[in-house]
Amino acid sequence: MIAIIDYGMGNIRSVEQALKYIGAEHIVTSDKEEILRSDGVILPGVGAFPKAMEVLEERDLVCVLKEVCDIGKPLLGICLGMQLLFERSEELKGCSGLGLLPGEIRKLKVSYKIPHMGWNELRKEREFPLWNGLVDGSFVYYVHSYYADCPDEIVCGVSDYGMQVPGFVAKGNVFGAQFHPEKSGEIGMQILKNFQGVVEAWKSSRLSI
């Protein structure tokens, strides 16, 4: 069971429809116990980083997400959800994030139009489970104005937009996609299937203990 966290700022419906399409068992919830009972978690998001953190704090979801990380449960952040995984954002007056990944979220510093919106090539930087079955250079769909300034060792895929934009990041059981898998056609469906596979593997490992 994959829990899609509903905190009022996510692209919930499109993520839910994508999971239905690939046949992944899921629930949309903001309930702590349901999240902790799940086998994997997706944190979607659209909007402003500071407001999202404020809402997560108000709903007591920050501690839940940190607990999810601590117990090794697979966690996937999408778009703003990915950005929230980092330590801090400079958006507006600046704001602390969840601190599950090292790095800071910064405004895109490019001469191109902002937000970065549309299809872009995703190039492989290093292997990790969400690359399974994908061709290096596949096109994915972005909508964002900020990017993750983070250590190279957690960057698994990048796109060019006047600068290198981390598209895929990962550290341990924590995964992030700056682009929208749920809006990226069959490539995106494969990415979500790969996450489903990670979730199933984690569930099986827990059952065998």
Curated annotation (Swiss-Prot):
Pathway: Amino-acid biosynthesis; L-histidine biosynthesis; L-histidine from 5-phospho-alpha-D-ribose 1-diphosphate: step 5/9
Reaction(s) catalysed by this chain's protein: 5-[(5-phospho-1-deoxy-D-ribulos-1-ylimino)methylamino]-1-(5-phospho-beta-D-ribosyl)imidazole-4-carboxamide + L-glutamine = D-erythro-1-(imidazol-4-yl)glycerol 3-phosphate + 5-amino-1-(5-phospho-beta-D-ribosyl)imidazole-4-carboxamide + L-glutamate + H(+); L-glutamine + H2O = L-glutamate + NH4(+)
A cellular-component GO term for this protein: cytoplasm
EC number(s) from the headed UniProt entry: 4.3.2.10, 3.5.1.2
Record GO biological process: L-histidine biosynthetic process
One term of GO molecular function: glutaminase activity
Domain of life assignment: Bacteria
Location within or outside the cell: Cytoplasm
Keywords: Amino-acid biosynthesis, Cytoplasm, Glutamine amidotransferase, Histidine biosynthesis, Hydrolase, Lyase
Active site residues of this protein: C79, H180, E182
Xref: InterPro entries: Class_I_gatase-like, GATASE, Imidazole-glycPsynth_HisH
Quaternary data: Heterodimer of HisH and HisF.
Name of the protein in question: Imidazole glycerol phosphate synthase subunit HisH
